[in-house]
């Protein structure tokens, strides 16, 4: 190995804390790992140096000796040489857990039944906006692994009669070589149990579970939105040989409504009103999401594009007993068509008698245009 300074190799200062050393090591070991750099001899050599440096600096006693006596103490001529090919004493389990698809060692895998837990499942449900408003129970059906009824999930005929697994010799895990590392993985014969059932259940073959259809009612709470999910505990895949069941996650999609547009807990809608109501004010009846009709007051002088707020007429908030959003009514003033002669005469008379105060935006707009042209002409 090269005589490079261990602190320089790990890119830390000599007074770096143990956590800083570990953090830098994790970052560098991912970058230079041989499996991520196949055929790259420089990366392989760098990885060896990183591992050697961390082997020393992560150990308080070795680090103290290194700081006191220098690098030669840990080379082949020193008191504690580092043999890379013999394997690491460093625990890589937390570092490479995701890198190799799982943890290392029996302590994490074979000693726990967590890996035997059934998988979580996903189911997609579409509901109407009205159903999302009031809440609904939705019947669903799906096929998955369920607990075997013949053996009650234990996987054996009668009392369990187990023998040591011949594949892992009872360890629950097997070791395989991956480049420079020895990787410990769950035994695929006994699934980490270390033993196999001698008198396997004929129906499930010893797994404790069989394929079957599951039917249930899922409660969709009021106020639910697209993208929300409902968790149903224990309704996922059955665990292996009596291990914990997974959960079912029901993902919700709320259909688009023909009249209302939803924004969080608020509802928006567009409503046309007559010109006379817009000018004089009045009341119109509005449909609500709960199916009822509500009177909406239109202020005099209402313009197209104005927005009128109806408090508490929106969607209920999830997990709230009484709180609701608001409904926003976007007004469009409709110009009358197919007028009678009398109506035309009345409008002409109105136009003759109208002043600038009646249409301030209109008058202001054309006055602004006149001013612009006057400035251009005078210039």
From Swiss-Prot:
Subunit annotation: Homodimer.
Highest taxon of source: Bacteria
Binding residues annotated for Zn(2+) 2, in chain numbering: 165, 168, 187, 190
Family per record: Belongs to the DnaJ family.
Swiss-Prot/TrEMBL domain comment: The J domain is necessary and sufficient to stimulate DnaK ATPase activity. Zinc center 1 plays an important role in the autonomous, DnaK-independent chaperone activity of DnaJ. Zinc center 2 is essential for interaction with DnaK and for DnaJ activity.
Residues given in the record as Zn(2+) 1 binding sites: 148, 151, 201, 204
One Gene Ontology biological process: chaperone cofactor-dependent protein refolding
Annotated GO MF terms: ATP binding; heat shock protein binding; unfolded protein binding; zinc ion binding
Example of a GO cellular component annotation carried by this entry: cytoplasm
InterPro entries: DnaJ, DnaJ_C, DnaJ_domain, DnaJ_domain_CS, HSP40/DnaJ_pept-bd, HSP_DnaJ_Cys-rich_dom, HSP_DnaJ_Cys-rich_dom_sf, J_dom_sf
Domain J: 5-70
Cofactor section: Zn(2+)
NCBIfam families, per the entry: DnaJ_bact (TIGR02349), PRK10767.1 (NF008035)
Natural source organism: Anaplasma marginale (strain Florida)
Cofactor details (free text): Binds 2 Zn(2+) ions per monomer.
Keywords, ordered alphabetically: Chaperone, Cytoplasm, DNA replication, Metal-binding, Repeat, Stress response, Zinc, Zinc-finger
Cellular compartment(s): Cytoplasm
UniProt xrefs under Pfam families: DnaJ, DnaJ_C, DnaJ_CXXCXGXG
Protein name, as recorded: Chaperone protein DnaJ
